[in-house]
Amino acid sequence: MFRFASDIRRDSEGLVRNPFCIGVGLALLAGPACAQKTERPEVKVGDRWQFVRYYSVASTTPNVTWEINSVSEAEISGTENGEPLRMTPDLNVVDSPERKQSNPKALSFPLEVGKSWRHATDWLFKPKGSSGSIVVDVEVVAYERIAVPAGEFEAFKLVSKGRVSGTSPINSQYDAVITTTYWYAPAPRAIVKSVTHNPYLGVSTVEMVAFQPGP
């Protein structure tokens, strides 16, 4: 069954009490003594997350499920709601049922407060058939506790600002700034919450509802 907040929190509290931060892998690195800097997580076959994505009305009912079925040095692959999902080793989504990107870099490990980077990527938004490019500046701005439907987690807070350009299927032009604030939590090895302000799609929120680690 899925592990909810109480289970993961008990694991992380036990780790904090150990001054040497001895654990069973990055899945438990939730304590402040260990997670002020965090390395790339060890994603495993069988890892499974449930998220809720909503726009105007908040919800806690999951509508997105990720499950990992293959992990290599070059790529992580699995399914999103039963359809193909491909990610980089840093957990950046390359291809999903909703969108495709050439060079996603929302996460760049190791993470620590103050780190920043810039990346450019081509994108395809599948539901509308629109495409274009975006140049994004990302900064890790804080390490704090965040509450989501799955519970409370110690997480790195990141802010990205991207200048997007592109065309729609009817050849109208996109030119705007998209801002996303998101929180990566080492314990469930995932972005547990993101809030995106997109002038064309409105405000969208994604929150983690549950996490089940692989065997």
Q: Residues of each region from the PLM?
A:
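Bacterial N-terminal signal peptides that target proteins for export
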Residues: F4-I22
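Hydrophobic helical h-region of N-terminal Sec-dependent signal peptides
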Residues: V24-L28
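N-terminal signal peptide c-region/cleavage motif recognized by signal peptidases
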Residues: A30-P32
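Acidic, serine/threonine-rich low-complexity disordered tracts
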Residues: Q36-N103, H119-P215
